[in-house]
Design a protein with these regions (language model features):
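Short secondary-structure boundary/capping segments within folded domains
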Residues: 16-20, 32, 223
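Short, charged low-complexity linear segments at domain edges
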Residues: 1-24
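A generic secondary-structure signal marking the coil-to-beta-strand transition
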Residues: 3, 24-26, 36, 184, ...
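Conserved Radical SAM active-site core
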Residues: 8, 24-25, 31, 36-127
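Short, low-complexity, intrinsically disordered N-terminal peptides in bacterial proteins
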Residues: 1-5, 69-70, 203
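Conserved AdoMet/S-adenosylmethionine-binding subsite of the radical SAM
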Residues: 80, 91-232
Length: 232
């Protein structure tokens, strides 16, 4: 395996989102993103990182995942060990593709978190693709690549980050229009929209005129509308 990636960090933690939430996971955070979502909490990964050879990354993942490869937890959950590529936007670096393939070949359950702004069709089909559909408050709704929806399957997941009433209504309309619940699990993640004075100047501003929604209000709406989503 030849080539390299610019990596922000590699670490072991518990998966906090998706249908894999709560499981141990090795995270590979890659550097660079071409979106500037208003609520981004990893802006440090836009530029900070170090070039690392794929073989070095692979070895580090194996080292961190080793305790879970033969543990009792592994016997209870065959999905372990988990590895997730995140960012930043992993698909901006083409060598993320052979790395994911190699990790799958080595028996890892591989996840990728991607913005939905780049073609996902070239990703190894064994990889679980957790793809965003950017809502209005992100400031990046125009970057959604609609053609990606046709490439999703039952092992993938779609994530909506909801911070306003308009986000909720937009997400609900997308679910209905594309019958998304018949494709894969759907995730709703709540976010508190930042006031202008709280926002980093490198991020898109929250579009004017949107109505913030609280976590409680979002949960109540999901229940009232019987939406087929997982609230996280």
């Amino acid at each position: 395996m030849t080539g390299s990636l610019v990596v922000n960090e590699i670490y072991l933690s518990l998966q906090g989102e998706s249908t894999f939430a709560g499981l141990p996971c090795v995270f590979i955070r890659l550097t660079a993103c071409d979106l500037r979502c208003s609520y981004c909490d990893t802006a440090y990964a836009f530029t900070e990182g170090k070039k690392r050879e794929l073989t070095e990354i692979f070895a580090k993942v194996r080292e961190l995942a080793a305790p879970f490869s033969n543990s009792k937890l592994k016997a209870q959950n065959s999905k372990l060990p988990l590895v997730e590529l995140t960012g930043g936007e992993p698909l901006l670096q083409k060598n993320s593709l052979p790395l994911m393939q190699a990790l799958c070949n080595d028996g890892f359950t591989v996840l990728i978190e991607t913005s939905g702004a780049h073609d996902i069709s070239q990703i190894d089909p064994r990889v679980h693709r957790i793809m965003d559909l950017k809502c209005p408050s992100s400031g990046e709704v125009a970057r959604n690549l609609a053609s990606n929806i046709a490439h999703l399957n039952a092992t993938d997941e779609i994530k909506f980050v909801i911070g306003t009433l308009e986000d909720y209504e937009w997400a609900k309309a997308q679910i209905a229009a594309h019958k998304l619940d018949s494709i894969c699990p759907l995730l709703f993640s709540w976010v508190h929209p930042l006031a202008p004075e709280q926002q980093s100047k490198v991020l898109k501003p929250v579009p004017a005129g949107l109505t913030p929604i609280s976590r409680k209000e979002l949960a109540e709406k999901i229940i009232a509308d019987a939406l087929p989503v997982r609230f996280q």
